[in-house]
């Protein structure tokens, strides 16, 4: 029997949140889970499905989330946008590790201010692409380089793979901003989101109209890799698998430039593809984060601090897990 208190997944009855609950259950059958949401019936259905779980109603308008004083959790994973930040307040008030997935780069200030005021538990800022999956793969491949000069990331999300209503609302909110942040030659600057001519190349070579975007990878990777240029382009369109008449997938292409450990210099390309779309990748990113925050991997639990996925989770381990769960991650031919 697990000695851990339940892991609270707020939004756990939504499409990706439920996927994360199932993934965490698969990795750790004994860890209790609480499925939190506004609709008790939906939360109860997911809790019943995964087992060793309970359903709780969450009220984000209240600092106590509407929970009874006797409730306690080992960690909180936040799958919905919380414009009150009451879930983060609750986590800090109760010294509970917290993971947020829906905050934009232009919205992070209030979260950091709350954390700086009361840094009582670890806080994983998980709004990197697919919960940090892209950055974890980049750190894994960057180990082939002695120095990294630039990182270019291009994500192709299939238009049939938007997920549930909460995910669609997040997408609309995060992509309506007029400017996105990028690092070029060591200098931060804002770029027009709808910059003319931006395209994303699918893994079968098609040019898909895209836009600049700045998930948290853009400002975490310069720190973790030393890169002086980091850019992220995004497109919503037809993935290679669906173009072939198969179900949609999700695609991330990565280009790393710098001096390799074999003494050569140049640009290497890599591909990260999951044949079932973005949900299983994001879900596993969250499950690995919870695992590391709580020390479920046999190591000490994470200390209080601000973290990105690649500063918390061991990248090589994550890549192996992604592959085991169906992803293809490899250097491009």
Label the model's feature ranges.
Residues 2-21, 41-54, 72-75:
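Conserved N-terminal glycine/acidic-rich loop preference
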Residues 10, 14-18, 143-269:
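Active-site-lining helix/loop region of Rossmann-like oxidoreductase modules
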Residues 73-80, 91, 98-100:
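N-terminal Rossmann-like NAD(P) cofactor-binding module of classical short-chain dehydrogenase/reductase
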Residues 121-143:
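Short alpha-helices
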Residues 236-333:
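C-terminal active-site/capping subdomain that shapes the small-molecule cofactor and substrate pocket
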